[in-house]
């Protein structure tokens, strides 16, 4: 009976996915659930889905604590899994080696706040402060607070974030090189006006505590807001921010070389004095001169004379901007030169990927950010793969796309766009295209198996023959059948990397599946896990082992150390 109970406690049920295919769903196993949670931590605007992920994270922490207290698991297993869950917070927010997600990271913070407020506060501290680059930036203060207020939780965390920001401002006001904290302080007349008042009241708390009457308190509050405005203005002048020059009608003094990747990306049309359709915005001399400076800079970038920062731009935003430039016929504009240059700079964070092929899901369920991210990730893989610049798109019908004639990012997007987008998800047809080519060319087993097949998708594929089971089982069986067809000996499948780009409740594989990986998110950073892995190592890898490798980055050791101290 005990064996049956244990089997049920660790059982992973199956379900029918959105388009009729068999898939795994949320598991009863703690370890399986941790990997599944990570796999579904991909950007979404669906509040109900985020709430579901919050529930799963909460259940995992609750189950771990209960199992440890009732002696169902040893201390080592308890601490190990708690450490993974805590490091997952850092990885989810990390803009350097992780997923770079805001809302999902705040959701995980809120869950940890429910279980351990000290650890939640420490994790947030790592978002904004660190010996190296923090996981996020000072921008996280206002957005994290907004999330907590909307979900009516985290008051201690909110107070701590306010304390951290104001302490940094006190350091910056006397520092020769201030941080960017002041840049991200919300303005009084903005959507974050209530937070501005809280920040000002905290910074000048002595004004308010000395007030003895309602009238004097009102005056003290007014003075605290006025002085806080002056403080932020002084620090921003010290930082010499773009906004200061724009507000001062000194656009021509904005230096193109000093712009951050995000500022250049978001304001390139403003700097160039252009509308989206390429028309001039204004004839003001200051704006025209500014545009001239940025046009010259863009021209130098196009010829390779200078670089334009692009590492912090989301891959989905690259594709979105490229499609917009294509739509308006602006592929040869200065805006296009800037976007292409930023793509080149962004690509520096991804190493050579060996023999990897990208399969891009361009079906209707991927529309919007998931599709844009899939296209950009697929193009990044094509550029870095030893096999050459090729991608396979799939929707109603697959298309093998040769990108050799494309000399920049926008031209690659334009070429891929000619495939059929927005239809159903006929993954079987895409897989058969690969297998038919293998048969036609009579490829040897080593040529078939020695590669990574990366499926960039939401994994909601069309119904296949039920005998094949899950998506991974389908792939393995189809490769085995092809080997038998050619050589009377089954092929091993190549290493399959399932890269999830839309949060659902389905899973293509179990955590213990050999020769497979399960990643997710819009950041290319996790691709680097495959830069040094040979095929022998990959064939023995499982989704769990690759996940643990990703979470074991030195950047997250500080979280593990703090958790061990807290739970000692």
Regions found by a protein language model. Name each.
Residues 1-373, 383-568:
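Long lumenal/extracellular ectodomains of secretory and single-pass membrane proteins
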């Amino acid at each position: 009976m005990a064996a049956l109970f244990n089997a049920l406690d660790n059982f992973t049920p199956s379900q029918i996915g959105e388009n009729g295919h068999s898939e795994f769903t949320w598991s009863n196993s703690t370890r399986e659930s941790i990997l599944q949670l990570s796999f579904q931590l991909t950007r979404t605007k669906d509040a109900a889905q985020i709430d579901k992920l919050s529930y799963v994270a909460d259940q995992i922490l609750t189950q771990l604590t209960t199992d440890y207290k009732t002696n169902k698991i040893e201390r080592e297993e308890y601490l190990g899994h708690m450490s993974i869950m805590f490091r997952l917070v850092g990885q989810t927010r990390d803009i350097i080696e992780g997923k770079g997600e805001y809302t999902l990271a705040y959701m995980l913070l809120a869950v940890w706040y429910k279980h351990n407020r000290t650890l939640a506060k420490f994790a947030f501290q790592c978002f904004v402060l660190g010996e190296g680059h923090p996981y996020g930036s000072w921008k996280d203060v206002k957005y994290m607070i907004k999330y907590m207020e909307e979900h009516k939780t985290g008051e201690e965390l909110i107070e701590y974030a306010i304390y951290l920001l104001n302490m940094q401002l006190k350091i910056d006001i006397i520092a020769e090189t201030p941080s960017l904290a002041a840049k991200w302080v919300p303005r009084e007349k903005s959507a974050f006006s209530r937070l501005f008042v809280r920040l000002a009241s905290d910074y000048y708390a002595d004004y308010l505590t000395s007030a003895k009457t309602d009238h004097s308190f009102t005056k003290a509050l007014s003075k605290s807001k006025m002085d806080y405005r002056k403080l932020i203005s002084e620090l921003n002048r010290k930082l010499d921010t773009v906004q200061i020059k724009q507000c001062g009608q000194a656009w021509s003094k904005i230096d193109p070389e000093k712009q951050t990747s995000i500022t250049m990306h978001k304001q390139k049309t403003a700097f160039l004095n252009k509308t989206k359709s390429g028309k001039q915005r204004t004839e003001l001399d200051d704006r025209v001169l500014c545009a001239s400076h940025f046009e010259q800079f863009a021209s130098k970038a196009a010829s390779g004379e200078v670089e334009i920062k692009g590492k912090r731009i989301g891959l989905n935003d690259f594709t979105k901007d490229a499609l917009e430039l294509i739509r308006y016929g602006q592929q040869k504009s200065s805006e296009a030169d800037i976007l292409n240059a930023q793509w080149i700079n962004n690509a520096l964070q991804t190493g050579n990927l060996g023999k990897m092929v990208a399969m891009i899901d361009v079906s209707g369920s991927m529309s919007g950010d998931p599709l844009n991210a899939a296209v950009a990730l697929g193009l990044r893989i094509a550029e870095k793969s030893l096999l050459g610049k090729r991608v396979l798109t799939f929707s109603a019908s697959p298309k093998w796309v040769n990108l050799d004639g494309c000399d920049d990012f926008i031209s690659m997007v334009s070429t891929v766009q000619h495939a059929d987008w927005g239809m159903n998800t006929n993954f079987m047809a895409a897989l058969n295209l690969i297998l038919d080519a293998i048969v036609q060319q009579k490829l040897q087993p080593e040529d078939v198996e020695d590669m990574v097949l990366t499926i960039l998708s939401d994994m909601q594929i069309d119904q296949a023959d039920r005998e094949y089971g899950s998506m991974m089982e389908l792939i393995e069986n189809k490769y085995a059948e092809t080997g038998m067809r050619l050589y009377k000996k089954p092929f091993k499948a190549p290493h399959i990397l399932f890269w999830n780009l839309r949060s659902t409740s389905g899973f293509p594989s179990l955590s213990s599946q050999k020769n497979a990986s399960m990643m997710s998110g819009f950041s290319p950073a996790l691709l680097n896990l495959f830069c040094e892995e040979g095929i022998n190592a990959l064939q023995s890898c499982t989704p769990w082992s690759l996940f643990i490798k990703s979470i074991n980055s030195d950047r997250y050791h500080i979280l593990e150390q703090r958790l061990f101290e807290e739970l000692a």
